[in-house]
From Swiss-Prot:
PROSITE patterns: BRCT (PS50172). This is DNA ligase. It comes from Shewanella baltica (strain OS155 / ATCC BAA-1091). The active site is at residue 143. It is an enzyme of class 6 (ligase). Zn(2+) binds at residues 390, 393, 406, 412. Residues 570-648 form the BRCT domain. It comes from the Bacteria.
Length: 648
């Protein structure tokens, strides 16, 4: 257990609060992360103290702990002013003014279950209002961790206690801009600082970005580095109204909850401490309303960064598909953010060597909510043990920059097995060839992709699969050949370094599969998007797989060929870049389908004729005036048949 003590700076912040309390008791409670020994008054003092420290940029406990203490106090004192109003800022600039609009805090959730409960309340409100629940739109935005303020177009206010704030318009006078030069007057938002800019230019001088935000609105003389940050647009006022966002209904959200949260979470370059979910329908908002602290139609989803110090039991080398040997630290099993963690990868063996990761080392592990845990730092290093032989084939390992590598490309079981797994996973058009079954087959001697395709149902059975499974595996293999797949996907399934799907597609826009294997480093380096080092790696990688590749290719996969760049260019249609408008009833089919087709041919489809329109395509029953109008504007009028002739 760490013993916590307030430092001088914190003590001076606390002094201004004028709480009458034995600070020693608070220090013990913070150390123990427990309030069991505090009276109600002491608990309130603890909340006030931690809040003030948090607001001045030096939080001393985790948000989740603060929130649990807050909840305990709220339980016994639901009507206490500390509970019913928003936690106040500690900045005091003197006079307060009424805010143009109430600024509330947000309700908080730390788990998907809590979010589901909140969504259920939204859906219930929809039902009470007789609104189709599928139509209820949820909007999710990143929760900016800056300094809350409200811009009414004339003045900028701090949130204050949510009802009265302070006029800090001087921030704009100091050159602060609204993000992306948006207009003023977009309401609530936060003053935020670009993370990368802070790291690069400000972190040597300021402990955290909150200090800077406070300086902009509070101080008489703002540091010139901060003024520079404002001038360069790295420090802005970001209204919530113009945040990147995800919208969709309940079902959309539930199909990919983790993915959506992660995507929104990472959508801005500012500090974020959660995401905000809200119902957008004004009827729902009115119906659900707010209490004195938060809107019931809005909630913050936060994730707790959990840290643990864990002992390493051993470091296991694992050979990957490419031959790189990855060190995996086996840990004394420890619960972090709700999951039992017993292993974590160390990036490469150079890290093991430099940082001293080995049996008996103590490492600090961090897990941010949904994310895979990682080693943050090594607290107690030991002498690391470096493997000399490949754990799979016992070849002597070689160093390649930071990595230990098994040089046995053709016959290392770990490499061949992982290559098979990668192949079937990339094809993604068949079932049955996951890691488990592949391991079973590989152990029994199936080393190469082409060997897999040689297997007959009775052979699967010989390898210990049941009769039905054997037949199914055989059928799946045939299907994977017969179902059409793109040639670039097929090539990328061989797992050559630097030949992921994107690069394969780019290359196959210039070369056929057969030609590509003949291409030289110079040929590839000449193409847009390929540096010389990549070209070298690609040529080498292709040479390594050439024999196996053609054994598999010759099995007759149903490949769709990537269109060649030259063809794409000569294919430019007569509609490329033209603006067309359709009017009247078409004989050939629905007008909407024709519009889609025109778009696919590169045209822009307009809804009304302007002088920029290239063609007006007139179907049946089009009035004479419309046609004459178009002609007057210099627009070429085509009948449906003339149009079809043009594009055929
Ligand atoms: N660790 C600590 O010691 C400590 C102390 C006090 C408070 N806290 C934390 O602060 C919370 C209370 O602070 P708070 O009232 O400022 O609430 P908050 O900061 O958690 O969230 C509410 C605020 O989020 C802002 N916000 C940011 N992005 C937004 C968006 N996209 N849409 C809408 N609003 C957005 C708004 O200004 C709103 O007022 C506590 O629940 C706790 O988690 C921690
Ligand atoms: Zn090996």
């Amino acid at each position: 257990m760490k013993e916590f003590k307030f430092n001088d700076e914190q003590l001076s912040t606390i002094q201004e609060l004028e709480v009458d309390i034995d600070l020693k008791k608070l220090e013990i409670a913070i150390s123990k992360e427990s309030i069991d020994e505090l009276s109600e008054d002491e608990l309130l003092a603890l909340l006030k103290v931690t809040n003030a420290l948090y607001r001045s940029g030096f939080p001393v406990i985790e948000d989740i702990l603060y929130d649990s203490f807050w909840n305990k106090f709220a339980l016994n004192h639901p009507n206490h002013p500390f509970i019913t109003s928003v936690e106040t800022e500690v900045l005091n600039l003197g006079k307060t003014v009424a805010l143009p609009q109430k600024m509330l805090s947000t309700d908080k959730a730390y788990s998907k279950e809590e979010i589901k409960k909140w969504l259920d309340r939204i859906l219930k409100a929809a039902e009470e209002l007789d609104i189709d629940t599928n139509e209820i739109e949820i909007r999710i935005t990143p929760k900016l961790d800056g300094y809350a303020a409200f811009d009414d177009g004339e003045r900028l206010y701090t949130r204050g206690d949510g009802v009265k704030g302070q006029d800090v318009s001087r921030a704009f006078e100091r050159g602060l801009k609204v993000v992306r030069n948006s207009e003023r007057g977009l309401g609530a938002g936060e003053i935020v600082i670009n993370k990368a800019y802070f790291e690069k230019k400000l972190s040597q001088y300021f402990e955290n970005s909150r200090n800077i935000q406070a300086a902009i609105i509070a101080e008489k003389n703002v540091d010139e580095r901060v003024l520079e940050a404002i001038k360069e647009g790295a420090c802005v006022f970001h209204p919530f109204a113009v945040l990147p966002n995800w919208t969709g209904n309940y079902q959309d959200l539930m199909t990919d909850f983790d993915g959506i949260i992660e995507q929104v979470w990472n959508s801005v370059e500012y500090d974020v401490d959660g995401v905000i979910l809200e119902a957008t329908d004004t009827r729902i908002k009115e119906h659900m309303g707010a209490n004195r602290k938060f809107h019931r139609w809005q909630i913050a989803f936060k994730i707790n960064d959990e840290v643990a110090e864990v002992e390493v039991i051993s470091v296991t080398p694992q050979t990957s598909r490419t031959g790189r040997v990855t060190p995996v630290a086996e840990l004394v099993p420890t619960r972090i953010s709700g999951a039992m963690i017993s292993r974590v990868t160390v990036h490469h063996y150079n890290m093991v060597k430099i940082n001293g990761v080995g049996p008996g080392a103590i490492v600090q592990i961090v897990r941010s909510g949904l994310v895979i845990p990682k080693i943050e730092k090594v607290i107690k290093p030991v002498d690391p043990q470096m493997p000399e032989l490949c754990p799979s084939c016992k070849s002597h390992l070689l160093w390649e920059s930071d990595h230990l590598v098994c040089p046995n490309k053709s016959d290392c079981p770990a490499q061949t097995e992982n290559t098979l797994v990668h192949f079937f996973k990339t094809l993604a058009n068949n079932d049955g060839f996951g890691p488990k079954n592949i391991e079973k087959l590989a152990n029994l001697g199936v080393k190469h992709i082409h060997q897999m395709y040689d297997l007959k149902p009775h052979q699967f059975a010989m390898y210990g699969f049941g009769e039905k499974t054997s037949k199914n595996l055989y059928d799946q293999l045939q299907a994977s050949k017969n179902i059409e797949i793109e040639d670039w996907r097929f090539l990328s399934a061989f797992g050559v370094s630097r030949l992921g799907g994107g690069n394969c597609e780019k290359l196959l826009q210039h070369y056929s599969l057969r030609e590509l294997f003949e291409a030289t480093v110079e040929d590839i380096a000449e193409l847009n998007g390929f540096a010389r080092v990549s070209a070298e790696a690609i040529v080498k990688g292709l040479a390594n797989i050439k024999e196996e590749f053609f054994k598999v290719y010759d099995l007759g996969f149903n490949l769709s060929i990537t269109p060649k760049q030259s063809e794409l260019e000569s294919l430019a249609s007569p509609l490329t870049g033209k603006i067309v408008v359709f009017t009247g009833k078409m004989l050939q089919g629905k007008r909407s389908d024709m519009e889609k087709h025109a778009k696919a041919l590169g045209a822009k489809v307009g809804t009304s004729v302007t002088s920029n329109t290239t063609y007006l395509i007139a179907g049946l029953k089009v009035g004479e005036t419309k046609i004459n109008d178009a002609k007057e504007k210099g627009v070429k009028v085509l009948s449906e048949q003339e149009y079809l002739d043009l594009i055929s």
